[in-house]
Amino acid sequence: MTQTHPIHVFSEIGKLKKVMLHRPGKEIENLMPDYLERLLFDDIPFLEDAQKEHDAFAQALRNEGVEVLYLENLAAESLTNQEIREQFIDEYIGEANVRGRATKKAIRELLLNIKDNKELIEKTMAGIQKSELPEIPSSEKGLTDLVESNYPFAIDPMPNLYFTRDPFATIGNGVSLNHMFSETRNRETLYGKYIFTHHPEYGGKVPMVYEREETTRIEGGDELVLSKDVLAVGISQRTDAASIEKLLVNIFKQNLGFKKVLAFEFANNRKFMHLDTVFTMVDYDKFTIHPEIEGDLRVYSVTYENQDLHIEEEKGDLADLLAKNLGVEKVELIRCGGDNLVAAGREQWNDGSNTLTIAPGVVIVYNRNTITNAILESKGLKLIKINGSELVRGRGGPRCMSMPFEREDL
């Protein structure tokens, strides 16, 4: 926290001082094979090992002098009185689309009976199985209760929460509180709402450049802060162009200091779900990139003049474009998997491009992406390698699992 701003992020590579994570919890154990697609998962991580891997990730950050915050703690600290607590519970139930009146009442009573705030937050994250509620007489069941009688959950779990990068994004001194691609993940942004409204340190003290009530979608994996002057945003499977326009108008109007935005349009599919799964900044003049996006990639330059956005498609070489906008002589694009198409596909799927830079040239990576890691090391980068055999099953890497709150200026 700076003296005047609790959020301070003006680059992707400035020394990381403070970061928010979420330790995977019981929500992971509420994944079932029949409902993986509904919950945006491809597989079921083993929770015990996922927690060990995540704890090692957090410790690696602490070893580098980073203060680690946890989403579950910040959310719990935001429930500062009984009125806010009940408001949170009612909003949580409302957004879970619980339609049966008797079911709503039973869920509300269950949650109100949890007196510890952190336990309450973790329960809302884990979801609520129907077996946890008292039997509801048939005469009191709503149509939804009857139609979905075989579905085991009264409220779905939120297994994607350990990817803290997406529900909101820190941009300069502000925050984009996102409206997410799927209903499953959109509920996650409720925690950010309460943190930035009611938390003793952050509530009401951070300018909002996007609100979760918007109807168009945007996710934090598509929001990158390249420098104090330049942002990059992805037009992807999870983020649409209309959201980007709203975001950019707000950023420019809030006078956060940014002068230009580079909008990257690339393939719309799950393996390239966010810009940061195919493109991350690792040093002043170096980026990782997945070679498969390069052929179809289109880049637009966006500025704000006379109360309006000015958009122009950029032509030519991506490395030259980045160098020009970052004020460096030359930019090197380091290809995930090198020149081998098979290795590139495999290591991108396992988040070889999704690196977390904690200082210029110092990067946290999954140890499993051996080819990409060897290339990064050959370019002079210092790698901090973590095990992610279970964490990667959720299709996210170190950048996906972290939300910077404070970085040193470059």
UniProtKB/Swiss-Prot annotation:
GO terms for biological process: arginine catabolic process to ornithine; arginine deiminase pathway. Its EC number is 3.5.3.6. It holds the Pfam family ADI. GO terms for cellular component: cytoplasm. It is an enzyme of class 3 (hydrolase). One of its GO terms (molecular function) is arginine deiminase activity. It comes from the Bacteria. It is found in: Cytoplasm. The keyword Hydrolase applies. It catalyses: L-arginine + H2O = L-citrulline + NH4(+). Pathway: Amino-acid degradation; L-arginine degradation via ADI pathway; carbamoyl phosphate from L-arginine: step 1/2. Keywords: Arginine metabolism, Cytoplasm, Hydrolase. The active site is at 400 (amidino-cysteine intermediate). Belongs to the arginine deiminase family. NCBIfam families: arcA, PRK01388.1. HAMAP family: Arg_deiminase. This is Arginine deiminase. It comes from Streptococcus agalactiae serotype V (strain ATCC BAA-611 / 2603 V/R). The gene is arcA.
